[in-house]
From Swiss-Prot:
Protein source organism: Natronomonas pharaonis (strain ATCC 35678 / DSM 2160 / CIP 103997 / JCM 8858 / NBRC 14720 / NCIMB 2260 / Gabara) (Halobacterium pharaonis)
Domain S1-like: 6-80
Function of the molecule: Seems to be required for maximal rate of protein biosynthesis. Enhances ribosome dissociation into subunits and stabilizes the binding of the initiator Met-tRNA(I) to 40 S ribosomal subunits.
Designated gene of the protein: eif1a
Entries under InterPro entries matching the protein: NA-bd_OB-fold (IPR012340), RNA-binding_domain_S1_IF1 (IPR006196), TIF_eIF-1A (IPR001253), TIF_eIF-1A_CS (IPR018104)
SMART domains noted in UniProt: eIF1a
Stretches that traverse the bilayer: none
Protein name per the record: Translation initiation factor 1A
Keyword field: Initiation factor, Protein biosynthesis
Length: 97
């Protein structure tokens, strides 16, 4: 038995992407997120994710901050509960996020 038996390959941040936790649902396809870099941002859920991937408070997501407005971002990926637990175990995200 190997140590990686229960491990799943997860999507990791690329480029400017950062991990974040959804703190509040704002409506109109927008959520308030607390990012790993310590910034609170308003994130937009893109059309390709609407109605396909449901995002709730306390979900761990991957966001890409806007180049021209750092307090806003786009949601790129949502992690399921088991995936978020794995990220915490591996030290990629902390509970203080």
């Amino acid at each position: 038995m190997s140590d990686n038996e229960g491990r799943k390959n997860l999507r990791m941040p690329e480029g400017d992407e950062v991990f974040a936790v959804v703190t509040n649902m704002l409506g109109a396809n927008r959520v308030k997120v607390r990012c790993m870099d310590g910034t609170e941002r308003t994130a937009r859920i893109p059309g390709r994710m609407q109605k396909r991937i449901w995002i709730r408070e306390d979900d761990v997501v991957l966001v890409e901050p806007w180049d021209w407005q750092d307090e806003k971002a786009d949601v790129v990926w949502r992690y399921e509960k088991q995936e978020a637990d794995q990220l915490r175990e591996e030290g990629h995200i902390t509970d203080s996020v």
